[in-house]
Regions:
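Flexible "stalk/tail and boundary" regions
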Residues: 1-10, 14-15, 24-92, 100-164
């Protein structure tokens, strides 16, 4: 079964909570109800099962040693620390989006949002921002297809620079 796929419109309630649709709730409950919220640079809130987040953040063999010598690395740690928070899915299937995250991402109580599956988790998007992002994705796919078609139609025996 494919996990964390699809998209659904939801409402942020007056307390800043989002009720997860059954399909996403089932996916999260395969691990447990412990999730990590992370504000993404694209303008969405990523929600990841805790084990997935741990995998995403692995990679630096000695983070403390690197933090001692790298301003850039400390800034990266600061960004992740400030824009990330552990959370639990309630028994009612809701997640509370922290107020600072809502303000940063334009996710207001009473507002419709879009939940988008990403195969490793779910993103919460402001509906307008999601339309903009989806347009970017569609344009990228169109351009990629045009480049592939152009490459397929090139004259045999010529490389892509036009030389033989």
């Amino acid at each position: 079964m494919v996990r964390f796929c699809g998209q659904e419109a939801c409402l942020i309630d007056a307390n800043g909570r989002v009720k997860l649709p059954p399909r996403f709730l089932t996916d999260f409950r395969q691990d447990d109800e412990s999730v990590v919220l992370h504000c993404l640079p694209e303008g969405a809130l990523g929600i990841y099962p805790a084990p997935v987040w741990t995998q995403m953040r692995q990679g630096e063999a000695r983070p403390a040693a690197k933090a001692a010598t790298s301003i850039l690395f400390r800034r990266q740690l600061r960004r992740f620390g400030a824009l990330t928070q552990s959370e639990r899915i309630t028994n009612q299937g809701r997640i509370t989006v922290p107020n600072p995250f809502r303000e940063l991402l334009g996710l207001e109580p009473g507002q419709n949002v879009i939940l988008v599956g990403t195969e490793i988790g779910v993103e919460i998007w402001n509906a307008e921002r999601w339309q903009d992002e989806f347009q970017i994705l569609r344009e990228h796919e169109r351009r990629k297809a045009e480049l592939e078609m152009t490459a397929d139609l090139e004259t045999p025996g010529r490389d892509r620079s036009g030389t033989t």
